[in-house]
Amino acid sequence: MASSVMSSAAVATRGNGAQASMVAPFTGLKSTASFPVSRKQNLDITSIASNGGRVSCMQVWPPINMKKYETLSYLPDLSDEQLLSEIEYLLKNGWVPCLEFETEHGFVYRENHKSPGYYDGRYWTMWKLPMFGCTDATQVLAEVQEAKKAYPQAWVRIIGFDNVRQVQCISFIAYKPEGY
């Protein structure tokens, strides 16, 4: 019985020569003595990674007589061909088109909710029902024309909903009243 028991020290010292040379021993951290102690200070602020110094300033959106509406509102009004292209993109992604209109405030303002963020406190009125199963962009454009005829002083926007994820994926102004 005593002959079958080995000491743990004997097992630990018995190793293969190939295994011992596979892992290099830890030598510790490098000494900082090789770095120069006195360095020339760099006073050039353009090399510092910060938010100041070398910043390209952009003008902000002028708030007087230039209201911000929705996506693409900084562009000129979209033509019918451009609207068709946007609607085809919406349909190609499998989103459900829906039209909404607003007769008083087609721009961002705070009425029902005062904190900033995605929700801006506006409620738009839905034009008819969402166009489930619509595959033709001209049908959506015809509804835009009908909404313009019924409410010529209203903003009309097109929204694309993803009915699987249950989120709004796209929204843009299709019509602005005269003078805006």
Curated annotation (Swiss-Prot):
CDD domains recorded: RuBisCO_small
Organism for this UniProt entry: Solanum lycopersicum (Tomato)
Location relative to the cell: Plastid, Chloroplast; Cell junction, Plasmodesma
Function as written in the Swiss-Prot or TrEMBL entry: RuBisCO catalyzes two reactions: the carboxylation of D-ribulose 1,5-bisphosphate, the primary event in carbon dioxide fixation, as well as the oxidative fragmentation of the pentose substrate. Both reactions occur simultaneously and in competition at the same active site. Although the small subunit is not catalytic it is essential for maximal activity. Involved in antiviral defenses.
GO biological process terms held by the UniProt record: defense response to virus; photorespiration; reductive pentose-phosphate cycle
Record-linked Pfam families: RbcS, RuBisCO_small
Gene Ontology terms for molecular function: ribulose-bisphosphate carboxylase activity
Further remarks about this protein from its record: The basic functional RuBisCO is composed of a large chain homodimer in a 'head-to-tail' conformation. In form I RuBisCO this homodimer is arranged in a barrel-like tetramer with the small subunits forming a tetrameric 'cap' on each end of the 'barrel'.
Name of the protein in question: Ribulose bisphosphate carboxylase small subunit, chloroplastic 3
Keyword field: Antiviral defense, Calvin cycle, Carbon dioxide fixation, Cell junction, Chloroplast, Host-virus interaction, Photorespiration, Photosynthesis, Plastid, Transit peptide
Name of the coding gene: RBCS3
SUPFAM superfamilies recorded: RuBisCO, small subunit (SSF55239)
Subunit structure: Heterohexadecamer of 8 large and 8 small subunits. (Microbial infection) Binds to tobamovirus movement protein; this interaction seems required for viral systemic movement.
Feature: transit peptide: 1-56
Any one Gene Ontology cellular component term annotated for this protein: chloroplast
Top-level taxon in the UniProt lineage: Eukaryota
The family this protein is said to belong to: Belongs to the RuBisCO small chain family.
